[in-house]
Amino acid sequence: MTRLAILLSILAIGLILLIINHDTGRTMGLANDQFGQLVSLGAIATLIGAGILQSRHRFGEGLRQIAIWLFVVLALVSAYVYRFELEGFGNRLLAGLIPGRATIITDSEGQQEVVLQKMLNGHFETTATVDGKDISMLVDTGASNIALTYEDAEKIGLDPANLNFIVTVMTANGRAQAAPVMLQEISIGPITRRNIGATVAAKGKLDQSLLGMSFLSTLEMLQMRTDELRLRD
């Protein structure tokens, strides 16, 4: 068996064991991070040992191969150890490229958070799935309920002609009449709420649908930072 085959076998077996035991957090009595370090050290030791055995014939070439494989092993181990940070970086990058995109991060305890990046207008916006349709919504902690524009209500299948606009609400355009409705389902990433109350604003009275406190207050965590908003179910 060549050095490459031995090295790849060690790494493959170690990776398989880490994947199998990912949820338990431990592999062969060690924390997964410690086991990953042990696997990498074993691979490095094997590589160095094989290089020493052949150093009498091709010392320079052996050192070069060792350096290359050391870099590969360290890169793989680093990617595993910092997997959550790399995932978060990738999600933030996508959020910056796609305005309103909700990104999902998983912390070291396995808990998921939805992260929204602040828009250029200074507000937090996201695309929520409402009764099966994607709706652009403005996160508004000052709004007591979820509020849909007249057009978005039509988009999700509601017929405004059959609604009773009996509720008076305050919008950016002043006082307006709104109709109470019940949404079957609203989701932002993995966070889903069913049978939740909302209102539909009269036509032309609301510029953008609002994600209000009737949804936000049900969350375990709502954390606002300078440039991002974190939601946890």
Swiss-Prot record:
Gene Ontology molecular function: any one: aspartic-type endopeptidase activity
Pfam hit, one: gag-asp_proteas
Highest rank taxon of the organism: Bacteria
GO cellular component: plasma membrane
GO terms, biological process: proteolysis
Subcellular location: Cell membrane
Transmembrane segments: 4-24, 35-55, 66-86
Identification of the protein by name: Uncharacterized protein in cobV 5'region
InterPro entries listed in its UniProt record: Aspartic_peptidase_AS (IPR001969), Clan_AA_Asp_peptidase_C (IPR011969), Peptidase_aspartic_dom_sf (IPR021109), Retropepsin-like_bacterial (IPR034122)
The entry's keywords: Cell membrane, Membrane, Transmembrane, Transmembrane helix
Main location: membrane
Lipid bilayer topology: Multi-pass membrane protein
